[in-house]
Amino acid sequence: MPGLPYPRILVKVSGEALMGSEPFGLHPPTVARIARELVAARELGCEVAVVVGGGNILRGARVAGEDLDRSTADHMGMLATVMNCLALEAAVEAAGQPARTMSAIPMPTVCEPYARQPAQRHLRRGRVVLLAGGTGNPYFTTDTGAVLRAAELDCDAVLKATNVDGVYTADPKTDPTATRYERITHDQALAYDLKVMDAAAFALAREASLPIIVFSIRDPGAIVAAAQGEGRVTVVSP
């Protein structure tokens, strides 16, 4: 695929991004908009994998407590990601692009179990591959799962969709002096304890020499722009 800086991408979408203006769950017009952007990236020539979080339904680390152990809570969160992936799969197919949901937690009556080689075949055949269930293990975030799947699937970059247009020196919502990085290394992201992704995700990306492109999902066309190496982004790279 000549001319594309990232021929095979993994897009990480938070569960909260699917809420739109809703306080909980899914906002169908927002899901449809994100699906159209994924289809546009595919039409550009990129092979597209997607990891979706589950925070719009349940976040395991938040609900774990005295009466609910962390492992059980995390597995509940993984199931939430399956629901989100199925919704996004339907929206991608409604936008005219074949899609497949694959889950790290086997549930064959609902979707395919995740395995590396079948996932790569789906990508080569032009399908948008939605990766549900996180890593399949508790105590790992979907950000870490996204970097893991990107490394496994030989992706050229992780496109991390957030609510802000890149990585800042501090939270721009609370600190008016915060400035945005254009570029930063994995080592710097770890040393500065930046919260846009967890440390395990940055460390794994460093080990795999995998760039992470951070951008705002709220900006129309941002996924396609980031896939082309354009737009208002922060690049986290070796």
Swiss-Prot record:
InterPro entries given in the database record: AceGlu_kinase-like_sf (IPR036393), Asp/Glu/Uridylate_kinase (IPR001048), Uridylate_kinase (IPR011817), Uridylate_kinase_bac (IPR015963)
| Primary location | cytoplasm
The GO terms this record gives for MF are: ATP binding; UMP kinase activity
Binding positions (UMP): 54, 74, 135-142
Quote the pathway field: Pyrimidine metabolism; CTP biosynthesis via de novo pathway; UDP from UMP (UMPK route): step 1/1
Protein keywords:
ATP-binding, Cytoplasm, Kinase, Nucleotide-binding, Pyrimidine biosynthesis, Transferase
Gene3D superfamilies attached to this UniProt entry: Acetylglutamate kinase-like
Disulfide-bonded cysteine pairs: these are none
Q: Does the keyword Nucleotidyltransferase apply?
A: no
Q: Which family does it belong to?
A: Belongs to the UMP kinase family.
Subunit composition? Homohexamer.
The free-text function statement in the UniProt record for this protein reads:
Catalyzes the reversible phosphorylation of UMP to UDP.
Q: What is this protein called?
A: Uridylate kinase
Taxonomic source organism:
Azorhizobium caulinodans (strain ATCC 43989 / DSM 5975 / JCM 20966 / LMG 6465 / NBRC 14845 / NCIMB 13405 / ORS 571)
